[in-house]
From Swiss-Prot:
It is found in: Secreted. Keywords: Secreted. It comes from the Eukaryota. GO terms for cellular component: extracellular region. It comes from Opisthacanthus cayaporum (South American scorpion). This is Venom peptide Ocy7. Expressed by the venom gland.
Length: 16
């Protein structure tokens, strides 16, 4: 679950 949350945050950075 932690890994999934980290990946989601990383995706947000890429979008920004």
């Amino acid at each position: 679950a932690k890994n999934s949350a980290e990946a989601n945050e990383n995706s947000x950075d890429a979008n920004e």
